[in-house]
């Protein structure tokens, strides 16, 4: 039991337990999902023992600084002595949130989790302090299929992804990075992600097309099939096309929804040829008053819903497309017109206005579905 206690101390720092719940941790009746909210200044961390049998574990640390844990556990201990105990845990999905975490403690937790059957890891609202030590020669990486990061800051700046990557096995399939403090990476340090098929950079409004070029390290994401760029400050489809071409990224599905896109293309900008692999493009909620220039010549799916189109697109304005979605545009709704300049009326169909409330929920939810098929 003492050994298990040490393990949990490494994994502690979950989400949104009801304010009326007297205990910090709650395990459902099926022993499937366990949620802890340690909001007290001096929480009783032992309550987390309830989560030992759960498949999904969420731990929210209430913004506490976890540095005192370094005095209570040996983060440098050889985790192989815990291997059998860790393998017996049922946890497959782990969320850790709202804490200030020393990098040494994070590394200690990752070393222990490397012996677990964990497949999906979410880190959110964390401040990582200090630098991450290099991976020891005898250490094994964490075999994740999905890694999701939201509002995580790193003391190491642009090199954080490369430092974190060394603690992961190369089989990562889904990567989501939202509200990043440094969305650009140190590309010369980042190794390739050979198995990564879904990359979600949504909810980074300051990214922009120049930032996208810096984030898509050339030839480091060779297997990308799904790329989500919701609410990332993109300006034109052509600009995105150029960034993808420069990085050698050829997604099958591209989500540019919830960006304020311009329909016209800069005449001085070179023409960009989209990859023939792209067959699905989402341009919904983009404020478009007309079909933008520079779209791929052929698409299987094109979503132009919830824009500001005041007339049906002409055939010569559209690419060859099998599945076109135009729902929620003013020309389809009687009595809805485009706003005049300075008007308080947004010209947005009411149903679409309600849907924009979900903009904070990024494309991650869709992308993560592909990573849920673990054994």
UniProtKB/Swiss-Prot annotation:
A lipid is attached at residue 345 (GPI-anchor amidated asparagine). Residues 1-19 form the signal peptide. It is a lipid-anchor; GPI-anchor. Residues 346-375 form a propeptide. Disulfide bonds join 25-36, 34-51, 187-217, 241-272. It comes from the Eukaryota. Residues 290-375 are annotated as: Required for response to bacterial lipopolysaccharide (LPS). Coreceptor for bacterial lipopolysaccharide. In concert with LBP, binds to monomeric lipopolysaccharide and delivers it to the LY96/TLR4 complex, thereby mediating the innate immune response to bacterial lipopolysaccharide (LPS). Acts via MyD88, TIRAP and TRAF6, leading to NF-kappa-B activation, cytokine secretion and the inflammatory response. Interacts with LPS-bound LPB. Belongs to the lipopolysaccharide (LPS) receptor, a multi-protein complex containing at least CD14, LY96 and TLR4. Interacts with LPAR1. Interacts with the TLR2:TLR6 or TLR2:TLR1 heterodimers; upon interaction with ligands such as diacylated lipopeptides and triacylated lipopeptides, respectively. Interacts with MYO18A. Interacts with FSTL1. This is Monocyte differentiation antigen CD14. It comes from Homo sapiens (Human). The lineage of its organism: Eukaryota, Metazoa, Chordata, Craniata, Vertebrata. The gene is CD14.
